[in-house]
């Protein structure tokens, strides 16, 4: 049976660790927080991130990275997008070339505007990378609620290995070779979810959200295709599927942050109240720069940028979006 090491014992990393542990896989969870490590190893819980769960005994938490990595055939990057590069640097010289890196973070690197698999490839060029993505809230995965994701890689053999690793009766995995499309969909949908939350916070209705999600889907496809993704990917699980769940669920950090912003809070206040990383805010800045560079029209991203970084009022920004020049509906 395989051994899987997770870098990060947050909500999603812990949930996937539980899933694998219940399948009989040996799992190590590396984290810096000694309270989290103690809670997992002593109490078989991780109450800091997910309440009311029991962690199997074959899941062990470590503060020492070398111990966590010992014997691992797979390493799962379960850390926020802005620390992916640091995490990979920490892996240098500690893992063999045949260890498969599985990334579950969704976002883009601030400053370089690189996709996360590109960052991983820069730091760990000899290791194959698989992106595991799709509509999946940790709160539901940890409870065994049926969930379906995509394992995407340039190495289809590696994607199939990850598919076999995670598949069980309540966790279905498809494979996909469009890693660009999968990563772009997973990153941009967080911007649209922020905007959907703003609509909810202002008090707009279902009509508004349906329009925003649909036109948001067009933005995702537009920038994704421009960057080399396949059109069909954006209408699958990692595009439309992830967009739907992130824009509608109260588990969504991005939607919750958007609601608070729509109610008049600043981005900083919203992040503090949510209490966890809100990837859509970083993604908004990155994709605003990318769409300018690539010459792609992304009006929802434009408006989100004005609210998040230029101090525009949410209601005024929505008016700007609605009062743009008339045009034909198209992707």
From Swiss-Prot:
Its main location: cytoplasm. NADPH binds at residues 11-12, 32, 106, 138, 253, 277, 279. It catalyses: sn-glycerol 3-phosphate + NAD(+) = dihydroxyacetone phosphate + NADH + H(+); sn-glycerol 3-phosphate + NADP(+) = dihydroxyacetone phosphate + NADPH + H(+). GO terms for cellular component: cytosol. Pathway: Membrane lipid metabolism; glycerophospholipid metabolism. GO terms for biological process: carbohydrate metabolic process; glycerol-3-phosphate biosynthetic process; glycerol-3-phosphate catabolic process; glycerophospholipid metabolic process; phospholipid biosynthetic process. Sn-glycerol 3-phosphate binds at residues 106, 134, 136, 189, 242, 252-254. The keyword Lipid metabolism applies. The active site is at residue 189. Keywords: Cytoplasm, Lipid biosynthesis, Lipid metabolism, NAD, NADP, Nucleotide-binding, Oxidoreductase, Phospholipid biosynthesis, Phospholipid metabolism. It comes from the Bacteria. One of its GO terms (molecular function) is glycerol-3-phosphate dehydrogenase [NAD(P)+] activity. It is found in: Cytoplasm. Its EC number is 1.1.1.94. HAMAP family: NAD_Glyc3P_dehydrog (MF_00394). Belongs to the NAD-dependent glycerol-3-phosphate dehydrogenase family. NCBIfam families: PRK00094.1-2 (NF000940), PRK00094.1-3 (NF000941), PRK00094.1-4 (NF000942). This is Glycerol-3-phosphate dehydrogenase [NAD(P)+]. It comes from Clostridium perfringens (strain SM101 / Type A). The gene is gpsA.
């Amino acid at each position: 049976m395989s051994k899987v090491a997770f870098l990060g014992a947050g909500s999603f990393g812990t949930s996937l660790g539980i899933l694998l542990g219940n399948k009989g896989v040996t799992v190590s969870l590396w984290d810096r927080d000694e309270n989290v490590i103690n809670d997992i190893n002593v109490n078989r819980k991780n109450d800091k991130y997910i309440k009311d769960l029991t962690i199997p005994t074959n899941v062990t938490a470590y503060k020492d990275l070398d111990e966590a990595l010992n014997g691992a055939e797979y390493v799962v990057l379960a850390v926020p997008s802005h620390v992916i590069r640091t995490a990979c640097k920490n892996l240098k010289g500690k893992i063999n070339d045949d260890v498969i890196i599985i990334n579950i973070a969704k976002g883009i690197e601030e400053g370089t505007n690189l996709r996360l698999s590109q960052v991983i490839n820069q730091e760990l060029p000899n290791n194959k990378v698989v992106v595991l993505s799709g509509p999946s809230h940790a709160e539901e995965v940890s409870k065994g609620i049926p969930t379906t994701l995509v394992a995407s890689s340039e190495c289809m053999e590696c994607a199939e290995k990850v598919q076999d690793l995670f598949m069980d009766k309540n966790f279905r995995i498809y494979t996909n070779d469009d890693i660009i499309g999968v990563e772009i969909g997973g990153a941009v949908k967080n911007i649209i979810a922020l905007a959907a939350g703003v609509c909810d916070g202002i008090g707009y209705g279902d009509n508004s959200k349906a329009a925003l999600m649909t036109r948001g889907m067009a933005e995702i496809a537009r920038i994704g295709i421009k960057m080399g993704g396949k059109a069909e990917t954006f209408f699958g699980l990692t595009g439309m599927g992830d967009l739907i769940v992130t824009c509608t669920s109260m588990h969504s950090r991005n939607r919750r942050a958007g609601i608070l912003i729509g109610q008049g809070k600043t981005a900083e206040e919203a992040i503090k109240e949510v209490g966890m990383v809100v990837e859509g805010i970083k993604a908004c800045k990155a994709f605003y720069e990318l769409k300018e560079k690539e010459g792609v029209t992304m009006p929802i991203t434009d408006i989100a940028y004005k609210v998040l970084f230029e101090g525009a009022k949410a209601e005024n920004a929505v008016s700007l979006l609605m009062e743009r020049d008339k045009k034909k509906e198209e992707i």
